[in-house]
């Protein structure tokens, strides 16, 4: 007779695709082991099931979060499964707690197996979120906000930077002394000429190796030059003294050995289309109070031979061009440098700023550098090989360009770099190891190759990004530049935030280096807190084969957020679907909580329906929690149809599509557990045993559990031991826990038809772990 039952069961499933809508009682020795194994293998929709798979789609992850913030400040920590700041985000809160400078936040939380990173947020007293995307590695997450000197809690790439300084090359007294005997320049002179007693070069200065000249008082418009060292000079110094204005109306070129010195009160005026050209070992020095102005250009060609150009006064002209060969040019600015454009192509050239630079554009190739120790404002393109932002410095640009490899940025503490337009992050941006830097960008430029590159933003940098456009795709080829930053670019302790929300303060000082400054606004971030919802989908025919649409009972459970030292647990259970036509109940067994630690178990919404279903059922004890045994077992309902108002033999299928009855209002049960002693939130993966049950012929109910709990019972009964052994060998399942709201199959739709990737996952449960996000067709699933 048992063989005939087996044949009928197999035939009905494989040949006629009839649906099993009720269970027979759990019988001992229902089939012999080989026949039972054959039935299981033939009827389950997946063959060659992963023998090591446990059918779980979540796992426990340990998070360690350290905060080195303000002394005495407690910072809320919130861990999300997605970007919580995105307007389109459906990020769910996985864990929350508090951290400060002396106490880290350590918690065990549940994460979907498909989740490869989490978003750790540190919230300040204004309600502003600093977010750090952290990869899950070896089931751990380690996040660090800020860093104290000598701290061992954060792993940070150490970078030591320095903005070169330069003392004023001359004192006022020294220049005053030199101009006292300097020779006044005459029109047409070549200052490098040799002595000639029969010409204009018959003055003693033309015999000297180091020659000092000066511009006459008042105005001087004549042209002169330095032709080189052929006349015996090895240094030519030209002073533009106080009260003198040298007007350059065409090209004035000085070769090899000329230093142009503009004294306090002296002035050079370069008219439109005119140029001051310094070649090879020639360079300029502008003393405090001196100036070079006009609509013309300054050109430094073929290097300054190791001499530093120095400005402590005012340079306000059209262009500063540094080109040609040589070993590079250092241009030191301690005053004010105003340019329409700065162009540098000589390899090794460095623009070093300790004053104020305002430019229409800065265009340096990838072998030139900018080192900013004070304030820079570039209206348009800002391009360079390497940029160093010194301590307490500020730079603003319209566009942050890209011009090849090694065009990196190093930011020291209390530095701000702002790009009001597009900024290339196809580079390494390295922040401080002590203190914080702020990188403000409107839009990250979509540079070809960025997403595949090893570019990064690392260490203690806050990235304040205006355009947070995201593809919301995990596939790297579909990422936006902001996706790249979030999923790959931010490393170590680098964070991002919404505009105006950075935990960073640098007040403006009109007389100092910080002109714009920064202080966050007072409006908190608008972050919606959504708790995680896990779906439990059951087949009711255990231990016999089913139809495997996994909709006989579907529960959506809103979970408490993972945390430590809690004395109250709240679970919100939605009965989404009843795809069975027999009486089914459901319960919750919580591992790790002994009944002796329970103060009360109360029920909010749905309590009346629960009570009615239990009083009319023999499946569960009619109590808040069962008295048998030491484990905490909470009956959720004794009859799934009863809570929806169906009585007696009225048992329609509910909410499973096709010919089932649709539900307009989903039954919800709130379960509130109050404990005597605080505990950590129980793990969904390891501790929450949601199960369904039906009444067999004996006294005990038959229970249907998730695979990881299928050898345990919550005061009911399981299959016979020999049946359990066959189930263990075949490794099929009657229950699934999906770490999201599950769009479950419609009635009579086998799960492999609803989800094409389900079979691939079942074959190897280390792959296709997000199969539940990809239904084959919307008409094959029910989604709420």
Language-model features, listed with the residues they occupy:
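Beta-strand elements of well-folded, non-transmembrane domains
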Residues: 559-563, 575-581, 592-594
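A eukaryote-biased signal for long
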Residues: 624-784
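Short, well-ordered beta-strand segments enriched in hydrophobic/aromatic residues
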Residues: 63, 557, 568-577
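Bacterial N-terminal signal peptides that target proteins for export
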Residues: 1-10
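Extended low-complexity, serine/threonine- and proline-enriched intrinsically disordered segments
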Residues: 73-87, 580-624, 686-697
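Acidic/polar, low-complexity intrinsically disordered N-terminal segments immediately downstream
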Residues: 24-203, 492-544
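C-terminal motif of bacterial Sec signal peptides marking the signal peptidase cleavage site
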Residues: 19-22
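Extracellular beta-strand-rich, repetitive "passenger/adhesive" scaffolds
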Residues: 163-500
